[in-house]
């Protein structure tokens, strides 16, 4: 059965409260939990239901169930993971609420008729691509994930409204952005390695240890002539590469999959060189640059439009983020974190 965007029903966790007049414990019903307030933004409530029905929460619960099983609520690590992640999701919902309120004030809300039309079009595409236009299969999949067609459409419409509201607000905020030729030239001169005829590459190996002292001892052994691959197999704590002598294969200069500090240390090496200890979020590395492949840089004229688009996007994102933070600071926001789970 197809999974609809990895959606799943969020299990409601029972919450107990003490009455103010005595020690009688009252267990909230699922309906009461769903209606409980998790945050208020300028007087508008965000309910537990809003939080639990958010696709990010649904995906979170699906992943937790896969890792910890159906009885995940009995596992302290699982509960802590859910709480931490739901706090982040709630922050996003608060931001969305602030943006929606400001959009209403600025008359930037999307047209509801168009929204509903877009929703129907996208759901129809979903049915066609994933269920061969079979309504029965589609509804069975919805039911398995805890949705009726009506509740799924309501969730979908809400997400689409948030997306289109942000798009309209972004367009309004960033409409006067200009990128000068000097900005383009400066960016090009600073980032020439991004604009080569082919991606610049380096063949790397590394040895990972926990402490700087361990890394210094490893470096001394290498400086004294010991074989890099042999030492890596002996002491490296990177289980994915140690059996290959620490070999990481070919890595592009702009590879974002590696720790930024690790990449900075690697890029600073000449071919054949071995680094001093490099600290990253994983520990301390001794990095060896086995080989470098560098290619000619494209002319500015060939990449000018590409750079302009990049700078416009960067400026737009920065400006919108700054403006939203201003709106949030000017808002009255309260969170009731005890109601999150």
UniProtKB/Swiss-Prot annotation:
Q: Which PROSITE patterns match?
A: PPIC_PPIASE_1 (PS01096), PPIC_PPIASE_2 (PS50198), PROKAR_LIPOPROTEIN (PS51257)
Name the keywords, alphabetized.
Answer: Cell membrane, Isomerase, Lipoprotein, Membrane, Palmitate, Rotamase, Signal
Q: Where is a lipid covalently linked (N-palmitoyl cysteine)? A: 23
Q: What is its EC number?
A: 5.2.1.8
Question: According to the UniProt entry, where is the signal peptide?
Answer: 1-22
Tagged with keyword Iron? no
Q: What is this protein called?
A: Foldase protein PrsA
Source organism of this protein record: Clostridium kluyveri (strain ATCC 8527 / DSM 555 / NBRC 12016 / NCIMB 10680 / K1)
